[in-house]
Amino acid sequence: MRMIAITATFFLLFAVSASSQQGESAGNTTDDSTRAFLLSAADIAAHAAELDASVAYANTTVLERADPASTTGLAYRLAVDRRTPPQRAAQHAAEAELWAIVGGSGAITTDGRIVNIVEDGQTVGRRIEGGTVHRVSKGDFLVIPEGVPHQVTEFDPSLLIVTFEIPR
């Protein structure tokens, strides 16, 4: 139920901010958990423009709220990510994620199991075996529960994602 409420809240935040092009952002309220936080379409574009294009997994945290009672010390985190090849598979035991695709298109593989990629006796990466491929493009949302393997596996030319991380 908590995940549904958080997902619905994030969806409404994103839908309102993406459709509103007027007014200025209220600014970063990272340290003030008593105020709302707006991540406007203009803010997303500005953060994306600052990401290093030469880094396969470039991101910047735009909002982070603490919760000393959680296992990670965080209540939640919001970030702007740009994904380009190559990407490694990931799995988080104590963190769910909501990905809002805000630019580009591609595929994200989830579920299955993570296996090592071995070349000449050396582990050179990780991939998902037996997973589900989700074709995604701007406007799509993907909920990744804690413990679920996930990996961006196709890019056209990259994926720009607003990631909402929810430690459990």
PLM region descriptions:
Residues 90, 96-100, 133-134, 141-142:
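His/acidic/aromatic-lined binding-pocket segments of jelly-roll/cupin-type domains
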Residues 156-168:
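A short hydrophobic beta-strand segment most commonly corresponding to one strand
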Residues 1-5:
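Positively charged n-region of N-terminal signal peptides that target proteins for export
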Residues 115-138:
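An anionic, turn-rich surface loop/hairpin at beta-sheet edges
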Residues 6-15:
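Bacterial N-terminal signal peptides
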Residues 136-149, 153-155:
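Conserved metal-binding segment of the jelly-roll/cupin
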Residues 93-108, 112-114, 120-122:
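Short, conserved beta-strand element in jelly-roll/cupin
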Residues 20-91, 126:
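A short, N-terminal "cap"/entry segment at the start of jelly-roll beta-barrel domains
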